[in-house]
């Protein structure tokens, strides 16, 4: 069954660290200028852009997202600011602005809609197809990926992108299952099989044993690391002198890339020696924010 793109109720996402994002862009030296422009490189449901447009009455934002469901939701949420928001169907790795901007923000997390909507195939909490594509136009989904890769390459992928120590055992089990039954019936079927690779005591911990493998498959399907590396190279070129770039990451691979880029890029001044993390109140209200890390840099 195809998800109805017009049903905005399906997109219910809490943007993380919104207050901290607002504080970060306040560091732009010309923040009081009446010609502020920004790029929200991961528009999602429009949560961060909404707060920015609300706070800065003269701000104009270019919002990027390759997920049509996200763009539709953002269009509805940001209706009152329609004269100041331009929504572009683009991945941040493939974008080139016409003019330089005052600041760039990016939230690298998977949005709640993608997780909670079983038809997107990101989660094992509710059964759905093994899809995991943020952009439904991508050719390869998660089912294609596990069928195409050989056992060694699949194990390497799960270890590299999921930091999963049982990657070889999991890969062996997946390829054996595919050989015996043809394919998995859905996300729960795959998650159950992965859980069976763990000792009984580890199957019922707070974090589901399939979490790391699902993360690895999602990253690979969407080429997230390649896209982030490209974005980190491009984004400083989008900024005006003194411009701010603020990036929220959610796992160690992303955070390491952002940290090293901000420290090593001669174009940038790193403004966060250590990442900023959510406060206790936000974590209490939105448990998915607990792993978020915000890093900020400024164009020299």
From Swiss-Prot:
Keyword presence, Lyase: no
Reactions accelerated catalytically: cytidine(1402) in 16S rRNA + S-adenosyl-L-methionine = N(4)-methylcytidine(1402) in 16S rRNA + S-adenosyl-L-homocysteine + H(+)
InterPro entries linked: RsmH, SAM-dep_MeTrfase_MraW_recog, SAM-dependent_MTases_sf
Subcellular location, principal: cytoplasm
Cellular component GO terms, alphabetical: cytoplasm
Gene3D superfamilies according to UniProt: Putative methyltransferase TM0872, insert domain, Vaccinia Virus protein VP39
Superkingdom in the source lineage: Bacteria
A GO molecular-function descriptor: rRNA (cytosine-N4-)-methyltransferase activity
Annotated keywords: Cytoplasm, Methyltransferase, rRNA processing, S-adenosyl-L-methionine, Transferase
Xref: Pfam families: Methyltransf_5
GO biological process, one term: rRNA base methylation
Localization terms from the record: Cytoplasm
EC number: 2.1.1.199
Main enzyme class: transferase
Homology family: Belongs to the methyltransferase superfamily. RsmH family.
Alphabetized NCBIfam families for the sequence: 16S rRNA (cytosine(1402)-N(4))-methyltransferase RsmH
Functional description taken from the UniProt entry: Specifically methylates the N4 position of cytidine in position 1402 (C1402) of 16S rRNA.
Record's protein name: Ribosomal RNA small subunit methyltransferase H
């Amino acid at each position: 069954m195809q998800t109805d793109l017009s049903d905005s109720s399906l997109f219910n996402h809490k943007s993380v660290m919104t207050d901290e994002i607002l504080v970060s862009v306040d560091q732009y030296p010309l923040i009081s200028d009446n010609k502020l422009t920004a790029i929200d490189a991961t528009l999602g449901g429009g949560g961060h852009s909404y707060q920015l447009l609300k706070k800065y009455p003269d701000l104009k934002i270019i919002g990027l997202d390759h997920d049509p469901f996200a763009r539709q939701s953002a269009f509805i949420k940001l209706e009152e600011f329609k004269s100041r928001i331009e929504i572009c169907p683009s991945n941040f790795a493939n974008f080139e602005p016409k003019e330089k901007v005052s600041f760039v923000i990016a939230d690298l997390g998977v949005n709640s809609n993608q997780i909670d909507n079983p038809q997107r195939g990101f989660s094992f909490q509710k059964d759905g197809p093994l899809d995991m594509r943020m952009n439904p136009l991508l050719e390869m989904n998660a089912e294609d990926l596990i069928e195409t890769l050989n056992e060694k390459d699949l194990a390497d992928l799960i270890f590299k992108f999921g930091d999963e120590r049982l990657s070889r055992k999991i890969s062996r089990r997946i390829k054996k299952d595919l050989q015996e039954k043809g394919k998995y019936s859905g996300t729960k079927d795959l998650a159950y099989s992965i859980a069976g690779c763990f000792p009984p005591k580890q199957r019922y911990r707070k974090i589901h044993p399939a979490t790391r493998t699902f993360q690895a498959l999602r990253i690979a399907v969407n080429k997230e690391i390649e896209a982030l590396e490209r974005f980190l190279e491009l984004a400083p070129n989008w900024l005006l002198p003194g411009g701010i770039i603020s990036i929220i990451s959610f796992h160690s691979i992303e955070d390491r890339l952002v940290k090293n880029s901000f420290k090593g890029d001669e174009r940038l001044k790193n403004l966060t020696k250590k990442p900023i993390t959510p406060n206790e109140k936000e974590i209490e209200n939105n448990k998915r924010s607990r792993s978020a890390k915000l890093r900020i840099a400024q164009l020299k």
